[in-house]
A protein has these predicted regions:
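Alpha-helix capping and helix-loop boundary segments enriched in small/acidic/polar residues
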Residues: 5-12, 41-45, 95-102, 157-164
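Extended, well-ordered alpha-helical scaffold segments
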Residues: 1-22, 61-75, 119-134, 185, ...
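Extended glycan-interaction surfaces of carbohydrate-active proteins
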Residues: 18-104, 136-151, 217
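Surface-exposed interaction regions enriched in Ser/Thr/Asp/Glu
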Residues: 281-300, 370-393
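Aromatic sugar-binding surface patches on proteins
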Residues: 267-273, 360-367, 376-382
Length: 393
């Protein structure tokens, strides 16, 4: 403790290790990460999930990290019940093996968390919720250790009740889905929720911040989000940073009816409003309002026991110049249905089938290819253009 020279040496070694990592663990020819090396120094060829931890530690540059995330979001890794440990196109892939292509709940939860951290919340939500059907296998409410990589069925060596599966499922929801981070020393709650756009009402109870206990209620519409807070203790500093629709305009915030400063940060697939307040009352509310913006709703996968993966896999999602761009891996022999929520008007979907369900809801259908004779996935890119609402002009 207190050894300044040792601290400097450690920092230098850390920088050296970080700078050399991407060179040693990236295959420039294949443009893919390297999972590890054999004793003879030869790089292992199979693409797995090891690169996810490297992204979390910022050991790859932005371009490399984006490449990894694009690959893992694809159908080669993703199933309707989670993320394969090895891509199904790799030589070592075996969907029935314990760790060579099977689907782990622990690994799937970690991958979902990585996508929330990397500002790809729609993909993160799509991956995380594939774990929900696990509770219907064997005893209701229990989660297996590992499932097969080709069909929705427990892997033969799987433990039927694995604590780390349940723990990872819940911890990734706390950290990623609701974005709860507590600093008890400063009595500060950082709340960065990524609520699915079709969740109108959500509650979280018994959030402890120092000596305080908070109950939270979220009410969400296409044009706003209201957070109701009950505080049964001393004042709490709240950093409220919820996800808002891509392209949202005129974002405003209020604390208990009084205007509050708000900032907006923009990532390609993830926009957030930032409000910092002190909660001094037993009951408070923070109201956010905006205009326009676009949100995407993907149908929940419903895997059948013993059946293969068939649902669409979202690989990209962005909104630029009043145009929504969606990248999907789909089975072209079946309909692919999406829902868009927006205040924008007159969507133009080109060859896609588009139906207005409500003033702010549209169903988009990618029709099947009638000549398709198999159930393999294909990548599709879709663009939907909008006209701004009158109020935003």
């Amino acid at each position: 403790m207190g050894d300044a020279q040792a601290a400097r040496d450690a920092r230098e070694l850390g920088k050296k290790a970080s700078s050399s990592f991407a060179q040693r663990y990236w295959d420039a020819e294949r443009n893919v990460p390297i999972e590890g090396h054999r004793r003879n120094g030869q790089a292992m060829q199979d693409r797995g999930l090891g690169a996810v931890s490297a992204i979390d530690q910022r050991l790859f540059n932005d371009q490399q990290a984006g490449r990894v995330l694009d690959q893992i979001a694809s159908w080669r890794f993703q199933t309707d019940w989670g993320t394969r440990s090895i891509a199904m196109s790799e030589p070592g892939y075996d969907p029935t093996a314990y760790a060579h292509g099977s689907v782990w709940a622990l690994g799937t939860a970690e991958v979902a968390q990585a996508y929330w951290t990397a500002h790809r919340p729609v993909t993160a939500w799509q991956i995380w919720r594939t774990l929900i059907p696990w509770s219907s296998l064997d005893s209701p409410g229990h989660m297996h250790e590992v499932l097969a990589g080709d069909i929705f069925n427990p892997q033969v060596e799987s433990v039927p009740e694995q604590t780390w599966s349940s723990a990872a499922f819940l911890s990734s929801a706390v950290r990623g889905l609701f974005g709860i981070d507590v600093d008890a020393e400063s009595n500060t709650l950082s709340l960065t929720p990524h609520l699915p756009s079709d969740w109108d009402h959500t509650t979280v109870s018994n959030v402890r911040v120092g000596a305080s206990k908070l109950d939270l209620q979220f009410d969400q519409t296409v044009s706003g989000l209201t957070l109701y807070i009950k505080d049964s203790g001393p004042p709490v500093t709240l950093e409220f940073q919820p996800e808002i629709p891509l392209g949202a305009r005129s974002v405003a915030a209020a604390l208990n009816g009084n205007a509050s400063p708000v900032n907006v940060t923009q990532d390609r697939q993830d926009w957030h409003a930032h409000v910092k307040v002190t909660i001094t009352q037993a009951e408070s509310e923070i109201a956010l309002h905006w205009r326009d913006g676009v949100q995407l709703v993907l149908p929940a996968p419903t895997p059948e026991l013993g059946g293969p993966s068939t649902s669409a896999k979202l690989t990209s999602f962005s909104f630029e110049n009043d145009a929504l761009h969606i990248g999907l891996d789909v089975v072209r022999s079946t309909n692919t249905e999406l829902e868009i929520r927006t205040q924008l008007r007159n969507p133009n979907s080109g060859s896609l089938q588009l139906t207005r369900l409500a003033p702010d809801r549209y169903e988009v259908i990618i029709p099947p290819v009638e000549t398709s004779v198999n159930s393999t996935y294909q990548h599709e890119e879709a663009t939907i253009r909008f006209v701004k609402s009158r109020r935003s002009k």
